Amino acid sequence: MTKEKIIVIVGPTAVGKTALGIALAGAFNGEIISGDSQQVYRHLDIGTAKASAREQALAVHHLIDIREVTESYSAFDFVQDAKRAIEDIVSRGKLPIIVGGTGLYLQSLLEGYHLGGDLDQKELLAYRQQLETLTDTELYQLLASKGIHLDQVNRRRAIRSLELNQFARDLENQEAPYNPLIIGLTDEREVIYERINKRVDLMMASGLLEEARWLFEQYPAVQASRGIGYKELFPYFQGQASLEEATATLKQQTRRFAKRQLTWFRNRMAVRFDSISESSYPQAIYDRVERFLKEP
């Protein structure tokens, strides 16, 4: 069976994924699927770096503004929503382009797991999320306790082995459901950090403080409020930090988040990274996509 070709753009926050996605959508008759756990929420526009109205007018976007802030959203929900969006886009002869930095969501969509028995996929993904909280050392200690030996140290294989061990009768490891071209964007760490600092300043100038205050006053305990971009400003509203201190914390936490994102994609997904500072960018990516789409 022919697998549907999809483009997946990943990388740390503020590296330019949205701009590349829109450019590729225009060049290759594509539509964008957001792969970001926070952009699903309505009213949270600035802190989630959601594509602006102007950007959304340049390319159709899916999985943006599909939940109220009071609702929860999980990897399971994303997989179901993304599959429907891909089917819809392909049915109209267009190219699905997934753009986002929520690694667990993207990995869950691209993995070739098939639930063959009575196991509910929510149970599988809940177990996966539990494993993701473990350090590498804890993960390999768990493998050893179950008598599982891996020849190579690979976190992704370790988690897959534990899932298969846990759900041996209900989980079949089949081929991945899609044929993805995964594009990773990166740059020197200092460059990424400077982009993050500038973007936070721009967000603050664009009304992030008011957006965060609304969330703090109306829904301080919901899942959406735990995302980076909001909770760092809550101490300011509580009188526990100055605005300067809260903004500095937001920048720091966003930089740390970007570092974790890079580590995730390098260790757990087969990502080829392109530096956005290279003279060949983005033409090299256009050429790669063109070759990919021409392949049988």
Swiss-Prot record:
One Gene Ontology BP term is: tRNA modification
The record, for Gene3D superfamilies, names: P-loop containing nucleotide triphosphate hydrolases (3.40.50.300)
* Oligomeric and partner information: Monomer.
Which coenzymes or cofactors are required?
Answer: Mg(2+)
Q: Which organism is it from?
A: Streptococcus equi subsp. equi (strain 4047)
What are the GO MF terms of this UniProt record? ATP binding; tRNA dimethylallyltransferase activity
> Which family does the entry's similarity section mention?
Belongs to the IPP transferase family.
Name the positions where substrate binds.
Answer: T13, A14, V15, G16, K17, T18
Can you state which reaction this protein catalyses? adenosine(37) in tRNA + dimethylallyl diphosphate = N(6)-dimethylallyladenosine(37) in tRNA + diphosphate
Instruction: State what protein this is by name.
Output: tRNA dimethylallyltransferase
Q: What is the name of the gene encoding this protein? A: miaA
Site feature (Interaction with substrate tRNA) residues: T102, R128
Pfam families from the UniProt entry: IPPT (PF01715)
Q: Where does ATP bind?
A: G11, P12, T13, A14, V15, G16, K17, T18
Against InterPro entries, the record matches this protein to: Dimethylallyltransferase, IPT, P-loop_NTPase
Q: Which PANTHER family match?
A: TRNA DIMETHYLALLYLTRANSFERASE
What is this protein's function?
Catalyzes the transfer of a dimethylallyl group onto the adenine at position 37 in tRNAs that read codons beginning with uridine, leading to the formation of N6-(dimethylallyl)adenosine (i(6)A).
Q: Which UniProt keywords apply?
A: ATP-binding, Magnesium, Nucleotide-binding, Transferase, tRNA processing
